[in-house]
Amino acid sequence: MPRETAPREVTLLADARARARRARDWATADDLKAQIEAAGWNVVDTGTLYDLHRAVPPDVEVDGVLHYGGAASVPSRLGDPPVGTVSVVLVATDDAAAIARSHAAVIANAPSVSQVVIVANAPAEDVATVIADIEASAPETPPTEVVRTARRLGHGEALNAGLRRCAAPVVLLLDPSVEVRGDLAAACAAALADPSVAVAGPVGLVSEDLRTFEPADDAAGECDVDVIDGAAFAFRREDVEARGPLDDHFVIPAHLDTWWSLVLRDPWAIEEPVEGAPVRRAVRLASVPAVRHAGLESPVRGNQEKLEKKAFYRVLKRFATRQDLLVANRP
């Protein structure tokens, strides 16, 4: 859902705290942070700037089943040793047929998958029924785990909730609109076995200016691209800890794939970057059988065009000048 705007009194506290931090008055900054948190908000620093987030709502137990108030409440497996080969994450919201079809296709056609995580993102009633049926009938191998939320999360946060439960070394984010008809997971894992590759998937996009992105030429076969389309998007689980989490300002799917592709490829996106490290690659896979039945489903209502613009500005805020990340500008 669209991010809630903090009350003016909380924003004033945050502004005062930012000034204190710039002045290195840490005691005052800590006191102001405590006041912000007491008002029910969290402040997240980004350099000399900040973001305000409503504190995560409480988890809710319904009929003995825990529904998480936010992604941060979901117990994380990201620090555990990897298990299996590929974890698939599906986010279910309002399309019952899509989640049933996509999950069934993964189980039937992708033997490389070792775990499926379904995020039941405060779904519609018929979707909740389908998910319950999946839980009851899903095979033990690969296991299917359902993460339920107490409220409708934005797209980025919903994916974060699923990512926190992933156990395998490779993660495949799969939109329910996609029906795999072959072992897409195996193809993604094979591509990511190359340490120079950061992200892989069946649809790739390229750009000459970081403002407009176009599908890569189909005739090119498997090739390097700038961005992998978010409908089917694979990367290493270890990068979630090193470079994540996903930015939950992306409340709809639009442009989150662009942002995360560039974060994964950017040699400066880690805590201790190595001088001279190369830009990592995004690889568009060729001849991977999958059918996309519709566009990505938005988890939120509201003015989609306005939300898309805000999401794109989020990309530009970080990467507008990073021409070095574009395949077209390789030496």
Briefly describe each language-model feature range.
Residues T149-C166:
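Glycine-rich, basic loop-to-helix element that forms the pyrophosphate-binding segment
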Residues Y68-P81, A198-V199, E208, F233-A234, ...:
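C-terminal, non-catalytic tails of nucleotide-sugar-dependent glycosyltransferases
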Residues A120-V130:
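A conserved acidic beta->alpha catalytic loop
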Residues A104-V113:
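Short, acidic, metal-binding catalytic loop of nucleotide-sugar glycosyltransferases
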Residues G182-F213:
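Conserved donor NDP-sugar-binding/catalytic core segment of glycosyltransferases
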Residues V171:
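Short aromatic/hydrophobic "clamp" motif used to bind/position activated sugar donors
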Residues A216-F235, V251-P253, V300:
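A recurrent flexible, glycine/aromatic-enriched loop bordering the glycosyltransferase active site
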Residues G230, E241-R265, A282-V283:
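Donor nucleotide-sugar recognition loop
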